[in-house]
């Protein structure tokens, strides 16, 4: 199975399955000299872990990270960093009844079509538990970027058809962790929570939109034509399980605008080139303009629902019905926020190294 490596100069390789012994990541390309600890990684993993609120799966995992290599006396050595998280609360027997009946909306059928075999326990490699490795690697990318004044924040912009009001980067940063749905607008967050609770009672689920903003990005990041910054962001975010759409800046709204409305006029401010608006989302021609990066992903409803659905029995080759049991999130966006932030951080760490803004060997001077 290929496709487990992401990045060029700052690379991660994730490994493990939902109900295997452990999941983890190997990070390669982090320059020597970056101070970090398990606590820095754990802080991000705690935001992603299950069982943290009423809008997440009740699966109880501590998701405690162990750093196995690449660190000495509290600093990166420039060698590969391997991190591991043990799986401790897997209940594989819950999935035995659906071993031969692919779940609608899941990768069950397509994994069989591709490989001829699949780990049916919790989705195996296709489970969102794989994103633990992404978040751990992204935590290091965030730390690296913070040394260069680059900050990243994500939030739930929309959930179950309820949309938050427009907020600034600082407002989102200050308020996003104050609600279980990770929406920085308190009024919208309350309605979102009520909607998800009602859907959960019905045995159904809700989708939504996660927005990620990046502040402090220098102008000049990106490698046209095929490694455009926005193209790499799209690939990174579209690789997250359950993501079905991506947009940057005005996004699909740009299709309904005039050129005079869409174009961001240039102007001088404190001796620097800036723009009067940011419909381009901070990227022009695949290269960062120095404005904030603003991108969004559409997240589908959790496909694991207890409502009766139609499927097939791959053993008898007949039509069948399925009602999925087990412990599942009633909505995905709140726990996707740290995953989306991590993938964006990985893209920017990679491009900062590729574009020469960061010394690829050492931060020690």
Swiss-Prot record:
Cofactor: FMNH2
Annotated binding of FMN, by residue: 125-127, 285, 300-304, 327
Pathway, per record: Metabolic intermediate biosynthesis; chorismate biosynthesis; chorismate from D-erythrose 4-phosphate and phosphoenolpyruvate: step 7/7
Catalytic activity reported: 5-O-(1-carboxyvinyl)-3-phosphoshikimate = chorismate + phosphate
One GO BP: aromatic amino acid family biosynthetic process
Gene Ontology CC annotation, any one: cytosol
Superkingdom as given in the UniProt entry: Archaea
Region (Disordered): 41-62
EC number(s) recorded for this UniProt protein: 4.2.3.5
Gene3D superfamilies per the UniProt record, alphabetical: Chorismate synthase AroC (3.60.150.10)
Cofactor binding remark: Reduced FMN (FMNH(2)).
Keyword terms, alphabetized: Amino-acid biosynthesis, Aromatic amino acid biosynthesis, FAD, Flavoprotein, FMN, Lyase, NADP
Pfam families, A to Z: Chorismate_synt
Family matches, as CDD domains: Chorismate_synthase
One term of GO molecular function: FMN binding
InterPro entries: Chorismate_synth, Chorismate_synth_AroC_sf, Chorismate_synthase_CS
Top EC category: lyase
Family designation: Belongs to the chorismate synthase family.
Protein's job: This reaction introduces a second double bond into the aromatic ring system.
Name the record gives this protein: Chorismate synthase
The species this protein was found in: Methanosarcina mazei (strain ATCC BAA-159 / DSM 3647 / Goe1 / Go1 / JCM 11833 / OCM 88) (Methanosarcina frisia)
Organism phylogeny: Archaea, Methanobacteriati, Methanobacteriota, Stenosarchaea group, Methanomicrobia
Gene (name only): aroC
